[in-house]
Every structure is written in structure tokens, then in C-alpha cells.
From Swiss-Prot:
It comes from the Eukaryota. The keyword Transmembrane helix applies. This is Probable ubiquitination network signaling protein acrB. Keywords: Coiled coil, Membrane, Transmembrane, Transmembrane helix, Ubl conjugation pathway. Residues 602-788 form a coiled coil. It comes from Neosartorya fischeri (strain ATCC 1020 / DSM 3700 / CBS 544.65 / FGSC A1164 / JCM 1740 / NRRL 181 / WB 181) (Aspergillus fischerianus). Residues 33-63 have a biased composition (Low complexity). The gene is acrB. GO terms for cellular component: membrane. Component of the regulatory network controlling carbon source utilization through ubiquitination and deubiquitination involving creA, creB, creC, creD and acrB. Involved in resistance to acriflavine, and required for normal growth on a range of sole carbon sources, including fructose, cellobiose, raffinose, and starch, and reduced utilization of amino acids, including GABA and beta-alanine, as sole carbon and nitrogen sources. Residues 1-142, 343-372, 580-603, 831-859, 879-905, 963-1019 are annotated as: Disordered.
Amino acid sequence: MPRSSATARKSHSNRHENGSANTGKKVAKQKSNGHLNGNLNGGSASSSLSSSQVDLPSSRSSSDPVIPTTTATSTKLNGTPDSSKGDCNAPDHLNGYAKGNTDMSYVQNNGVASQTGGDVAGPASRRTEKSATGNKRSPSNASINPLQLASTILKSCPMYDTIAILIFLLQLPPMVLTLVQFLFASLTFLPPSGASAGSLTSNFDIFQGPAGTPSLGTMIAMDGFCLLIWGLFMWTWAQNFALDLAHVQVAITLGGGGFGKNGGVNTLCVGIVLIMHLVRSKGIQDFVIGHLLSSNIISPDMLSQYSHLLPTEFRRTEPQTSPSWLRSLLAVHILAQAGTAMARRSMAKNRTPNPPRTGKRIDTEASAGSQTQIDSAFESGASVSSYIGADGQIVTPAAHKDGRDRLLSAKKRRRQANQVRSRQPFWAALASTKITVMREYEHSRALSKTARGLPMTEDDLQGLSLDDGLVWITEIDSSTIKFAAGDFSSADDSSGSGACEAGCLGSEDMEPFYVCVNGALWATATICKVHDAPKGSSMVHWRGEISGLAPNCAYTCSFVRSDTDEEICVISVKTPATNDAEQVSSVSTPPQPSYRPSSPTTTLKNSIVNAEAKLNEKRSRLRKAKNDHKLVISKIRKELDNYNHRLHSGTDENRQKQRSLQLERNIRQTEEATALLEDQLDNLENVPDEELRKWSDQKAKYEHELGLLNSAKEELASARSAVAREVSSLETELSSAIQRRERLQSRRTRINEQYERIVSANAQGLNERERRAAEQFAREQDQAKLEATFNEQFASIGQSVQEYQLRAQQIWQQCDAIEQAIQQQHQQMLLDPGPLTPEGNLPGTNPFSESALPLGALTSTAPSNRSLLGLSFPPLKSSPLQTASSPVGASSSHPTSPVQQPSYLNFPTSPLVNASSHLDSDFVYRDRSFSNRSARSSLYGSDFMDSSRRQPFQLDLSELLADKRSPGSDSNTALNSGLRPVSSPFQRAGSRGSGSGSNGSGGSGSGSGSPSSVYGKTN
């Protein structure tokens, strides 16, 4: 019948066999070799003899009989002795619960387990009860309800546990609460691994401080510091609050609320206690009630009406009292150690790097707890040759060759284990304690039983009547497990067994059960029935072998009935390490074997790896055999060559003999071939008429078809020739058409080019005429503008010349007046009778009095407004730079007194004199272009002159005075030139001249230019 997929489910036992329980979290399943058990035992554990005691059930007796058996040289099923590969003790609790132990195998199936080899770890075998119907499955194979599975997992609720423990502690009487605090405080002085005389004398843990906890000196120092703060700085209310904070620390430690991601539990608990103390404080109550009454929020009547609703604990009539010294000391110690632990935890978190996120949750408590036991065994120094490992196996010194190396890191591992243990909540610690006690009890019980006898064999099971079929392990190899089974057709199941044999099984040799390894259906398991054993004389009815296993791995073998898919039993077995040197080199064993079964996928992978290793080994052996065969063949060939050489090198007689034998053999073969050919010829001569007629018919058909083929070929050839002629004519027509098209295209291209040249020539000629006309018009406009500009410049230059002529005439008039004044001054000085000696006034320093100076002599003889040749000129303007006032009044520009500073030395220059002349060599350079016809092109103002590039025109007065000219000689020429007066845009100012005179009888002057000379240059 088809096997159900329920057999492939995992049958792992999620038990905390490591000494500590998980804090409400589900342990991650190790699909591949999960090393959660610390150090493991390999191969054979010990060579010493051990014993086993088997408790057999009996429905007729109330006590369990004890059957001593031997396992020094265990007997195989075929009767030959075989040395055991490891000590295997098999205590079997047939009607109860059996715990795993070291190097032992338990089969809980109302039967007896016999072990003869291999290391069989502690399995959890169970017997399934018979169902009412044959097709009813066992509860283990039935589908598991998720809600039922979730209800079996203990949830981790550290906040709820911490708050519940805190509420419980706050409700305890003072005496009981003091006792609880004392017990909690005493835990800090005990080593985590337990106190013993050996540990105290060897390691001094009480003084050095156990791993993960501070030392005794640190504790005393912190307690003293906190006690000093308690007595000096804390008042009564703060002391009572700190006392309740000690309760909070106890609750957080026991409830596990201060570790992991539950940091908010501390704040919540402290907040609850703080709010409770604030509400119960009499000072705060008086302050709040007084504030409410003063602000008229509530009235005294309302307060008295609702005050009875508050509990009596909150209505204080007197202030709090200080706690007793004993409770104060305990609270100080608890709070000091809490602060120290927080500081150490924060420092360790900052110092250690963050572990990588692997995505798998590992039972760290289990691993740490198991390692602690091993470390304690290392450090205890007790004179024992072995100790109990974390997974219940006896760990011997042979399994720890590097024990001294790991002993150096024992303190570090113990610190980690103690840190994990300190973070366990109270209920987890209780569960861990219970598991440890139960395991130690079962271990001691198993050791007491094995001390009374030897393991039993299959011969000891003869004559025993069992209620149901029994399966036991007979031999364990590195890659195979051999087992045997009893009869599965019991008396109470005769009807079902008969039905299976008749219908489901079909024959007596049909397998009554199948094997699943680690939850996976194992196809390489072979089961065969034992026929030679007489009925009633032996319990062995079935024998089987599970192959394809990996060495040094743990497996969980499930035996399931074929008819009902019920589990007969579940056995946990660990295969020993291989002893073959070649296989060890080819197969890579895990670095640390696991005693827990792997997942089905991992099991199959390991089996595949083992099979591949064996295949590679066989291939290597085959290659080695091939090489050996090649060597043998080469050796044989050498011998054959040697024999041939000896044969050829023999005498003539031998050669003749060999030749005659060869000829005889050839003659015989030729005769046989000749006889065979004669028989064939005889058969061919007698041809039947029917076959001859068929042959003639077929030949006629062939000739007819051949004629049709020839005619078809001729028709095909004629058709091909006709088509070829048509194709050739069409090709010639096509070639001629292509040539005509090419000629037409070339002609079209030539005509298009001519057309484009004509169009471009026409367009180019029209554009050239327009361009020339535009250029001519532009040149005419530029010439007109240039002519107008020159005309304006000539007119402006003429106006400037006229202005210069007028200015020169005015300057000559001023020079005449100055000369007359100087002459009069000299005459006056000569007529003055003043002292001329050096002791008196110096020459030229005798001031003239205004009364002595004749006014008529100082006035200008020229009229204020005169006319020359019909031209009217404006009166002389005084220079704006002249500072001395006129001697005759405001209308005169001459100096007022000849005694003062001579005014002719300070004559200001005209702005036209400062500017450079338009007639010099620099006149051709202009900032403004002639083509720029602005609004002021005819008027050359101050912007037309660049005074920065021309030296100012300075008039030399001495030259003017020394010049002997006739009046009107040059001026008349300049005035009679026919130029009309033009208003000048330049503003004229007083000119500045230079003169020189002496205190002699007269003076002389000279001028640097004349109007005639300037005019001549202009013309």
C-alpha cells in the first residue's frame, strides 16, 4: 500500500537536555550539524567493561525482573562472536518514560534492546497503542493542530512576570520581605558553579570574583560608597523610595525583564513605585489639597464627602518613619550591585563587537549552560577519569586531547555561561534546576544498574513472550546499521495480522514495516524474513540493514508499520567514526560531531556525500586495478614476445613442422569452404517456376517504368531548353531597356545641370547690379556727409580765427595801458624826494599814495566800447582769475595802485589760450569721427578740445612790451579780410601774461604772437 507522507515528519525531541531552559523562545531547529552540546565523544568511549540491566515487563508480576547479560564479546545474529566497537549499555524502561544517558540506547516498546556496537545516544522510543481499526494512525503521525502546538510553548512575557513579582513582593509582610531580600543578596556571594571545598581552595572564586560577576572587593567598595550616600544625603522619603527600588530590582531579576529588548520594564516598574510614593507622601498630599482649596477648584465639603473613597494607606496622618538598619543594609547592597551590573553590562556592550546577523536563533543558554558543566569539571581538580557531558554522555580524557589548551579559555567560557544564567528569569531557573536534578537522578540510577551485571545478547531473549513486535539494533557500522525484529502477529492482533497477510501484504514475505531516518523515508533500507529459524525457538523473525549513512553522525530511525502507518519505535543512533585510513582521507568529517539528529534534508545530503565518497573510493580502486592489469598485460606480452622470438629462432626441423601444421590447417579450412559453396550451388540450380515467373513479371514492370522514366526525362530536357530560350530573350530585352534608361537618366542629369547654371547666372547678375547700385548710393551719402562735416569745420575754424584776432587786439590795448602806467610810475619814483640809501626804503618798496597817483594816468585810454572798421566789439571783460580790484573802479580791469603787486603779473589766461590751437600739427586727431553728424557738429565746445594733450597757451608780457609794431598794421589786415563776426561757443576769460620790468627809466615787453601770424597760419 502507498506509504503516507506523515512518516517523513521530524521526530526530534525538543527537550532541554542542556541544563537550562529557554526563556520562552522556541529553539531554532538545527537542520545541519548543530553543535549545541559542547564537547562530544567520538568513536569508542572506553575499553573498560560495562554492564547493563534490563527491566522486562510482565503482566503477571508486579516487580521488574532483572536479567544480567554480557557484552564483553557480543554475539552476532549468525552465531559468530564480534568485538563491540563501543560500550553500549541498554537499560530499558518498558512501561514508563526513559531519559537518554551516556553511551546507552533505550527502546521503549515493551521489549528489550540489545546493543553490540556503536555509540547510541539517548533516544526517546515509545510504543504506540493498537487502534480499534487497522487504518487508524498514531497521534504522532496525525496532523498537528497549530493552536495545540502553540499552547504547548511557554511564552516569554518578561513585563508581565516582572510586574506580577513586584506586586507580590509589595504585598509581603516586612519580615518575609526582609528574608527574601536577604536570600537574594546572598546569591551575589555564591559562585555560579556551586560552592565546594575544592573550588574554594583551588580557584579562590570568592575572592577573585566568579566569571561574569564583580569580585568581593568591588562589592564591598560599592556597598560602602552607596551606604555613605544613604546616610549623608538621603532623607526619610528617599530612603523608603530606595527600599522599594530594591524590590523592583529583585522583581526585574527574577522576572527577566531587564534583558534583551525589554528595557522599558525598568522604567515602568520605577514609575509605578515613584507614583505610589508620591501619592502616599503626606507633604505632597497637603500641598495638592491646599492648592486645590486655595484656588477654589474643590470645596472642603466636597473633599470631606469623597475622602472616604481613598484607601486608608493613602491617607497619612503622620510622616513616614526611617526603615530599620537591616533592611537598609540589604537595600543598599541590592541597589549597589544593580548599578555595578548595569555599568559592567554597558561597558561590555561597548567593548564587544556586534555579532553578525545569521538569521538563525541559537539556544545560547543551552550551549552556555552545557559548557559551564565541563568548565566546572576542568576546574574542580577532582581525581576522576571521566565526567558527564552536556548531552548525557561520559566524556573521557581520550576525547579531550586538547584539554589543556581549552583550559586556558575556561574562565572566558564560564563568564559567558554565568552571564547567560544571570539573564534567565525565575521560572527558567526553576525549570533548569528540575531538568538537571532529574538527569542526575536518572544517571545515578543507570550507573547503579549497570554495576550489577553485563549486557545481554539475543540468546537471553529466547523464551520471552512479548505483547507486540520488537525491533532492536544488532550492529552499528560507520555507514550501516543492522537491526532485527520479532514477530508482529501477536495474539491480540491476530485478526488484523491475518488481514494484512491476506490482503495488504499479499504474502508472508511482505515487509511488515518500513524505516524512516530523520523523518525521511529511507529507500536503501533492506528488510528480509528469517526462514531457517524454527518457530518458538528464536525471537528473530526479520532482519534488516540501513545503508548509505555517514560516519560520526546522529540519526533518528523510525520503524513504521506498513499497514496502519503507526510508529513501532523510534531509536536514536550515532554512527562511529571510520577506521579506514583511505576513507578518512576521502571523507571530510565535521569538525565537531553532533549528538542531535539532523533534518531530513541534511541526512540525505550526508548520505549522498558518503555514497559519493564510496564511489570515489571504488573508482580509485578500479583505476588502481586497471593499472595493475596493464602491468600484468605488459608482462604477459613480454613473455609472449619472448616465446615467439624463441620459436622463430628455433631449428629448421621445428620450422618445417610448424609449416606443415599450418598447411594442413589451411587445407582443411579450404575443403570446408568448398563444400559449403557446392551446397549453395546445388540450391541455386533448382530454381522454382513460380519464382521465375515472378521474376519475369517484375522485369517487365521494371522495363515499362524505365521507358516512362526515359520519356519523362526527354520531355523535361525539351521543356528546359524552351524555358532557357525564353529566359535568354527576356534577359536581352531587359538589358536593352536598362541601357535606354541609363542614357535617359544621363541626359536628364545633363539638362538639369544646364538649367541650374542658367538660373544661378540670372540670379547672380541681378544681385550684382543691385549691389553695385547700393554701394554707389552709400558712397555718395558718405561723401555728402564728409563734405558737410568739412564745411562745418571750416566755418568753426573761421570763427575761432576771428575770436583770436579780437582777443589779440584786446591784449595789445591792455599792454599799451600797462606800459603807460609803468612809465608814469617810474616818473613818479624819480620825482619822489625820498631817501634812496640802503638805510631807508629799498628801491621799489616806497608805496604810492592814492592821492599822488593821477587817476587819469591809470585809466585806460581806450574807450570802453569802440569800433574798428565798422565792427563793434564788446568792452573788455575782467578775468575770473584776477584777484586785485581795479584802481579806478568796478568798470576798470587795471590794478588800482602802482605800489601794490603789479597786476600784469597775475593776468589770467583765456580758456582758448589754455587749449591747443586748431591749427597745430595735432589738429588732425579728433575723438569724434567726421561721419558722426551730431546736433553740435557746427559748434566746437569744451568737449572738442582735449586740454590734457596740449600745453596751455602762455603769453610772454616781455615780448609784448618789446614788440615795436605800428598800430593797425596787422589788425587792419585781419579785420579787412572780409570775415564776418561769428559768435564763438567758447567762454573767454582773462588771459595770463608774463612780463618783466626794471626799476630803471622805462620798461620793455614782448609778445609771443600776433593776430596776423595766427590768421596767416589759418589761411
